[in-house]
Amino acid sequence: MSETATQNKETRGFQSEVKQLLHLMIHSLYSNKEIFLRELISNASDAADKLRFQALSNGDLYQGDADLGVKLSFNAEANTLTISDNGIGMSRDNVIEHLGTIAKSGTADFFSKLSEDQSKDSQLIGQFGVGFYSAFIVADAVTVRTRAAGLANDQAVQWHSAGEGDYTIEDITKESRGTDIILHMREDGKEFLNEWRLREVIGKYSDHIGIPVSIFTAVKDDEGKDTEEKHWEQINKAQALWTRNKSDIEKEEYQEFYKHVSHDFADPLTWSHNKVEGKNDYTSLLYIPAKAPWDMMNRDHKSGLKLYVQRVFIMDDAEQFMPSYMRFVRGLIDSNDLPLNVSREILQDNKVTQSLRGACTKRVLTMLERMAKNDNDKYLEFWKEFGLVLKEGPAEDMANKEKIAGLLRFSSTEVDSSEQTIGLASYVERMKEGQDKIYYLTADSYAAAKNSPHLEQFKAKGIEVVLMYDRIDEYVMNYLTDFDGKQFQSITKAGLDLSKFEGEEEKEKQKETEEEFKSVVERTQSYLGGRVKEVRTTFKLATTPAVVVTDDFEMGTQMAKLLEAAGQAAPEVKYIFEINPEHALVKQMADEADEQAFGRWVELLLGQAMLAEKGSMEDPSQFLGAINELLTKR
């Protein structure tokens, strides 16, 4: 290896987020410092994958050196550890882009989530993916020498930083293609200047890497003793894990491979490894993470699988093999049926891609169903992290709507908790005799749902109601119309009918009361005019004087709020005003002869109903005026 400095040396400042990340890593990840080696070897493996891919269309990039690998050497006297690869390498612009900045959207949001709690911070940093910067966990300075494939020897670059505010970059001459990372070790990082410690870490983290990882070590004599001669000895198996038989792979190997492909620190919740032969020949290895990425709900969040074709790496983040509502899935797919020169554009409309997407989707749904059935506690862990994303499924994937619906979890009146633990199948099992609908309520929050006046008749009749209070719920219910042969019924809709649960005597009494109150309803309708769609009596309330509901085919309150929050114009919702003739306030309103006072009562009851339904009203001053006037008269 021969490198010489030449010219064009400059000092540049780090992007501010890089400085913050370096500081946090040194303090938050210290207890797990050996991961720096996993990250750097993983990056070297990626560099080899990228060279293989580019060499498919330009074999000259190999420059006579097609045996790709990673090499580790150390110098205890100089206090340095060097990780070298002969992969794709980097140009000067690449180095500035990748080593001086964090090229990720939403980084400011990520850093805003960090705290002073080191254990929590380390988990967040792990989700962010530290990559190259992990070198500073054990090194007080790092030197990178790199030459991109296809560039001349004198177009190499040297980058150097002590991990503080800036770095230097200069042109050098480098004979070998690829990248050398030289770590100038801290005092507390010297444990890695030891061959057996390096062997231990490589065996733990990098056995599954598909290229050789070698150490520069002494040649053994016939008696197994070290000689003065040295050579490169391969340490890892260098066989891509997914190509091996499942029966030969240990649980720990699957877990470490997940960390390699995802750059996550935590073990996955579960995984599925499958080799399929038939119409399409492919291997898939799919993981369900334990923790959601910090930017999961960001529109620019990168998702998708690693794509290989005939064991050759093609691309990262191939989102064409997973629907958007499964963007939390990590792993890879290795196809024998796609062309090696496949592009993202070709993938988009490719029949093989569509077939593999369908198969992978079903595989993930099966994984989740198995988890929900066999380990409910683990499934609820998954739900807390990814439930909001999975809820997008019924709107996006009609073919698997029933399966997805079975995986959804909600709260309900059956449990006194905001935890979403109730599945639709368990709700159906508990349905009251004669009940043929799944009753649900959407609201802004659990508290608003739990205390909704719409629940009063259901509580009285002992009928369970599913409580939905995530913003996406109302949108999802536009697509989720039934489950297990049972129709969904919103309890805030005018078409709600529970008469089958009432006796004939009760029905007769309600009919008489409705007739008696006909004039009050007409008087109220006359006062309100076009402000409401209709006024009518209701017998579904116990302690509440009035509510508002919408027609079955009219947009609901929560959907209108969702559109408004997204900056879209929502059509005006025309409510039906329902009054409870058995409530003392309604009776007092009915007995009021003075039209102005009657109007104040109507404003009071309508205002209450609108507040309970929407959490707001168009004219609060009119409502407050009605309250003040009525209180003054008492």
UniProtKB/Swiss-Prot annotation:
The keyword Nucleotide-binding applies. It is found in: Cytoplasm. Residues 345-561 are annotated as: B. One of its GO terms (cellular component) is cytoplasm. SMART domains: HATPase_c. The keyword Chaperone applies. Residues 1-344 are annotated as: A. Homodimer. Belongs to the heat shock protein 90 family. Molecular chaperone. Has ATPase activity. This is Chaperone protein HtpG. It comes from Vibrio atlanticus (strain LGP32) (Vibrio splendidus (strain Mel32)).
